[in-house]
Amino acid sequence: MSNYNVALVGDFNVSVIAHNAVPQALRLTGIDITPVWFHTSAISDPESQFADFDGIWCVPASPYANTEGALSAIRYARERGRPFLGTCGGFQHALLEYARNVCGLHQAANAETDPGAALRLIAPLACSLIEKSDDMLLTDGLLGQAYGQSRITEGYHCSYGLNRDYEALLFSGDLRVTARDLAGEVRGVELSGHPFFAATLFQPERRALRGETPPLVAAFVSALAA
């Protein structure tokens, strides 16, 4: 059986629920995976640092110590066709990376770290989703295929999401929405033409804490061997 290396991009903290769930989620897939944590402050040369990794998972718990480090890891995965999963903070930063480097929105910012920014792509949610669960509707795509259904319930730990004012600009190309909550807010995206590039504001890895294999994580792992 093959072994796959997965880079976990994020600043590990044992007190963060999702950080305990992520390795468990990978183990529950039944595939031999070696996860390696990358503190964002240590990311300086993605081309060499991630060359031997089969996939990259940008994990929750942001703001990160080094925003640019996280963004460079995401860009590497996007441009090099490496399977990529972003959850919670990883979702926010996947949107930032795409906005800046593909859409030309070079000033795109996260209001959590730059509340006075002119272009607040990531903005406060109307209602905080700290330790809450919510329903979402899935469209055809990676998420819908992974879950095998059009409506799901997943857990969150966040207060910031996509500013709806920028949806038209952000989703005019290959990046598309594949999950929305019942109010129509974006909760999941994927990149067309990429082997596997998916990001969700929710934290699918939390299912592992109940002994369940998270469907989206299983799909990500399957892409490692494709």
Write out the residue ranges for each language-model feature.
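N-terminal beta1-alpha1 cap of cysteine-dependent amidohydrolase-like domains
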Residues: M1-R151, Y156-D174, T178-G193, L201-A226
